[in-house]
């Protein structure tokens, strides 16, 4: 029987990041997923970045993560957020071509010779003599020294559309929850939702506001210059709000009285109307999903209304009245594990050879999932090699802030990173990630020597120009000049905070 060093259950954003990071320093890695077609898929909003989230992606870029590289390759629309505010809250947001993104992920993953991929359904997980047995539906089993569970929102989950309920009764998903109950892991429920997708060929563009792309910086590799796709904006009005109120009985969110909590910063349209009754208009962003698809993502219209009500709702919104629904909106309720049972290295406190990463830890968003996947992957590989595990610090990275909050305070709602979550946000900026994390990345074995030397040459140039600041030519060294101005701006704070 072949014994694997690491087996990763689930191949979403956290699972793929875990596999890529572990494969840098370790061999004999296996990914088990129930559907190979969904490898690297963006199941909800096709966007990466945002306030706080882009800081995580930039940190992943320095650690050799796959998400920043794939998002730079597949971006079709870019926005620089908070540009008029201080540099510490400047954030980058990409609209992603979901097909290009998935294909790039698959290309990188299939080129890795030390990663095996298997499509299978898991029935049972058993710990036995410092090993883990993973049984599939055919009653065969894999043996692993370490497993990383990255099952996302698909553990014991149910989909709700109006009064219709569809349980995802795949043996793999349900048994993971049951297997972990046996080791006294606290399990509870969360929910999330997704809006409908429309046919963009039937939009009335004359009645929509246009949102143009910014030609901004990239996370790392600026090799996609086709980020010129337009997004569009429309609004609800009083008539639409009243229509939803009248048909609220057809919403599973209110009709079935959910006890689980959804993400605060991504509420459904029903939630918005009842929680903010004085708001007559709620913005709706229409975001194209791909160059190769006619689907458009209706950001801001997440709901769990019935099929017929969703059709009628679309017919009442300005600019999309004549469009057709390609995919309907729905809510999904799923199990998550209390992250306080984890060490900051993301292995379970009382089961050191089991790591948990992604939305099963109570987070929301691709960026948070990928960050956890990276930490779980690199630490599982270091554990195999009997090296000390990496414990991210909250004072020098947003990854540290994320894991510190999860493992110390747990969650009351799906956790989303923000710059406001960090006490040191003036120091943890998008522009100085190289200075903060380059040595850690090289120490962990994530950064090739060539790239390490390149980044060090940039740092050397920066300090050399800092000494000769009067001789700098603005247009020849604009990036360095800007960086010097920013760092001098925050010098007093950093000196007071860190060099008392």
From Swiss-Prot:
Subunit structure, as described in the record: Homodimer. Heterotetramer of two MnmE and two MnmG subunits.
PROSITE patterns: GIDA_1 (PS01280), GIDA_2 (PS01281)
Gene Ontology CC terms, in alphabetical order: cytosol
Keyword Metal-binding among UniProt keywords: no
InterPro entries per the UniProt record, alphabetical: FAD/NAD-bd_sf, MnmG-rel, MnmG-rel_CS, MnmG_N
Family matches, as Pfam families: GIDA (PF01134)
Compartments, record wording: Cytoplasm
Protein name: tRNA uridine 5-carboxymethylaminomethyl modification enzyme MnmG
Biological function: NAD-binding protein involved in the addition of a carboxymethylaminomethyl (cmnm) group at the wobble position (U34) of certain tRNAs, forming tRNA-cmnm(5)s(2)U34.
Cofactor: FAD
One MF term in the entry's GO annotations: flavin adenine dinucleotide binding
Chain positions recorded as FAD binding sites: 10-15
One GO BP: tRNA methylation
Similarity comment: family membership: Belongs to the MnmG family.
Keywords: Cytoplasm, FAD, Flavoprotein, NAD, tRNA processing
SUPFAM superfamilies: FAD/NAD(P)-binding domain (SSF51905)
């Amino acid at each position: 029987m072949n014994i694997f060093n690491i087996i990763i259950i689930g191949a979403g954003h956290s699972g793929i990041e875990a596999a890529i990071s572990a494969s840098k320093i370790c061999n004999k890695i296996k990914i088990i997923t129930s559907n190979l077609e969904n490898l690297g898929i963006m199941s909800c909003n096709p966007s990466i970045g945002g306030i706080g989230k882009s800081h995580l992606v930039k940190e992943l870029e320095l650690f050799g993560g796959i998400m920043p590289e794939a998002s730079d390759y597949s971006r079709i629309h870019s926005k620089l957020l908070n540009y008029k505010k201080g540099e510490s809250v400047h954030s980058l947001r990409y609209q992603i071509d979901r097909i290009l993104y998935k294909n790039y992920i698959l290309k990188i993953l299939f080129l890795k010779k030390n990663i095996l991929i298997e499509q299978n359904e898991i029935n049972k997980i058993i710990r036995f003599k410092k090993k883990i047995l993973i049984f599939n539906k055919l009653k065969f089993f894999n043996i692993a020294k370490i497993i990383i569970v990255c099952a996302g929102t698909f553990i014991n989950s149910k989909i709700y559309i109006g009064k219709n309920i569809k349980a995802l009764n795949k043996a793999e998903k349900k048994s993971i929850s049951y297997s972990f109950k046996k080791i006294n892991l606290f399990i509870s429920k969360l929910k999330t939702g997704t809006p409908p997708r429309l046919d963009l060929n039937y939009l009335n563009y004359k009645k929509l506001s246009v949102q143009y792309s910014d030609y901004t910086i990239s996370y790392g590799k600026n090799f996609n210059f086709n980020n010129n796709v337009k997004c569009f904006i429309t609004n609800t009005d009083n008539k639409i709000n009243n229509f939803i109120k009248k048909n609220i009985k057809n919403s599973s969110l209110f009709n079935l009285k959910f006890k689980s909590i959804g993400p605060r910063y991504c509420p459904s349209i029903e939630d918005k109307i009842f929680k903010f009754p004085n708001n007559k208009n709620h913005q709706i962003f229409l975001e194209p999903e791909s160059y190769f698809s006619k689907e458009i993502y209706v950001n801001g219209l997440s709901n769990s209304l019935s099929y017929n009500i969703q059709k009628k709702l679309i017919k009442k919104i300005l600019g999309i009245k004549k469009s057709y629904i390609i995919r309907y909106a729905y809510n999904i309720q799923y199990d998550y594990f209390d992250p306080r049972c984890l060490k900051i290295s993301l292995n379970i406190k009382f089961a050191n050879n089991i790591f948990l990463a992604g939305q099963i830890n109570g987070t929301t968003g691709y960026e948070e999932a990928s960050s956890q996947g990276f930490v779980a992957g690199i630490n599982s590989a270091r554990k195999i090699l009997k090296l000390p595990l990496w414990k991210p610090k909250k004072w020098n990275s947003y990854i540290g802030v994320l894991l510190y909050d999860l493992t110390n305070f747990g969650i009351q709602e799906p956790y989303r990173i923000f710059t406001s979550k960090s006490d040191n946000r003036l120091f943890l900026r998008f522009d100085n990630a190289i200075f903060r994390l380059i040595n850690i990345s090289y120490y962990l074995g994530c950064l090739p020597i060539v790239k390490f030397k390149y980044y060090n040459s940039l740092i050397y140039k920066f300090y050399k120009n800092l000494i000769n600041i009067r001789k700098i030519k603005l247009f020849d060294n604009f990036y360095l000049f800007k960086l010097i101005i920013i760092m001098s701006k925050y010098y007093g704070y950093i000196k007071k905070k860190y060099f008392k």
